UniProtKB/Swiss-Prot annotation:
One of its GO terms (molecular function) is 5'-flap endonuclease activity. NCBIfam families: fen_arch (TIGR03674). PROSITE patterns: XPG_1. SMART domains: HhH2, XPGI, XPGN. Pfam families: XPG_I, XPG_N. This is Flap endonuclease 1. One of its GO terms (biological process) is DNA repair. The keyword Nuclease applies. It comes from Pyrobaculum calidifontis (strain DSM 21063 / JCM 11548 / VA1). Mg(2+) 2 binds at residues 177, 179, 239. Residues 120-261 are annotated as: I-domain. Interacts with PCNA. PCNA stimulates the nuclease activity without altering cleavage specificity. Residues 1-102 are annotated as: N-domain.
Length: 346
């Protein structure tokens, strides 16, 4: 999911860089699809294509999930991955439009490969990322074998993750998107599932985790509550109404919320007669009361190293030596998570 325009309004006073180690002993509910897409976009071969096994199956997501999760454990973080379930009906049109855009990007990739345009291959390949059901199932298998808890959300993953954070079972939600704040998560941590180093032009820059707290966002934007934040996001555009209200940018949307106070009053006045593809009040209700489940665990379990080797090395052609070294790190890191959890408790 993504409410990128809302992110433009969240200033420095509501977000701060933190060290990964500051999350030691804390449970973070990670938006699994968001993380997997990050891995697919960033873990690539020199020609811009994703990592693949000998059968031509993409493995970038498994590589990212395996090694990044170990990094989190080594920092003392307790990750729980939350997977999307069935999207709300009013999101289906947007999903279909995204699919068409990806298919078009895939055509551009194939054309660029034929014409030898390597830079364009990399550019369009990132736009053509697909996450198949088989890839998701492999990711779930890997997490199970690693002893990492994962949760199947009935609907939106970020809604479920926010629910877990609101209940105090997780300290924060981990995602690049801001939707979990709309779903009520008290905290959002960004940049957890991305490489700590990123190339910008010719420079390599450090990318630190970023903490955003819901209360700080509401205070900085002078909003009276989460309902107004949701209304603001709807004006700017969400996954359920990507275009938002035509002609209404971030600053104008904020002023409208300050002046009129609610979406209802706006619909009765300045937005009267504006046609919405989806009822905005229906969208707001979904953010306030999404389908969630209480059937989940945040506890780590014992890894099955043999199963990890079977999945990564034997089935997907990962380097046996690299995986063996990573398994040693995994064993040590799990002990660190247990220790830091006890330290945080006492």
């Amino acid at each position: 999911m993504g409410v990128t325009e809302l992110g433009k309004l969240i200033g420095k006073e509501a977000r701060r860089e933190i060290k990964l180690e500051s999350l030691a002993g804390k449970c973070v509910a990670l938006d699994a699809y968001n993380a997997l897409y990050q891995f697919l976009a960033s873990i690539r071969q020199p020609d811009g294509t994703p990592l693949m096994d000998r059968a031509g199956r993409i493995t970038s997501h498994l590589s990212g999930l395996f090694y990044r999760t170990i990094n989190l454990l080594e920092a003392g973080v307790k990750p729980v991955y939350v997977f999307d379930g069935k999207p709300p009906e009013f999101k289906l049109l947007e999903i279909e439009q995204r699919k068409k855009a990806k298919e078009k990007a895939l055509e551009e990739v194939e054309k660029a490969i034929r014409e030898g345009r390597r830079e364009d291959v990399a550019k369009y390949a990132k736009r053509a990322i697909f996450l198949t059901s088989e890839m998701v199932e492999d990711a779930k298998k890997l997490l199970t074998y690693m002893g990492i808890p994962w949760v199947q959300a009935p609907s939106e993953g970020e809604a479920q993750a926010a629910h877990m954070a609101k209940r105090g079972h997780c300290w924060a939600v981990g995602s690049q998107d801001y939707d979990s704040l709309l779903f009520g998560s008290p905290r959002l941590v960004r940049n957890l599932a991305v490489s700590p180093k990123r190339k910008v032009g010719e420079e390599v820059v450090e990318l630190s985790p970023e903490l955003i707290e819901l209360d700080a966002v509401l205070k900085s934007l002078k909003l009276k509550g989460r309902e107004q934040l949701i209304d603001l996001a709807i004006l700017l555009g969400t996954d359920y109404n990507p275009e938002g209200v035509p002609g209404v940018g971030p600053q104008k949307a904020l002023k409208l919320i300050w002046e009129f106070g609610s979406l209802e009053k706006l619909l009765q006045t300045v937005l009267k007669g504006v046609q919405f593809p989806v009822d905005p009040l229906k969208i707001r209700e979904f953010f306030l009361n999404p389908p969630v489940t209480d059937q989940y665990s945040t506890e780590l379990s014992t890894p099955d190293e043999r199963k990890i080797v079977e999945l990564l090395v034997e089935e997907h052609d990962f380097s046996q030596e690299r995986v063996a070294k990573a398994l040693e790190r995994l064993a040590k890191a799990r002990g660190k998570v247990k220790t830091t959890s006890l330290d945080a408790f006492f």
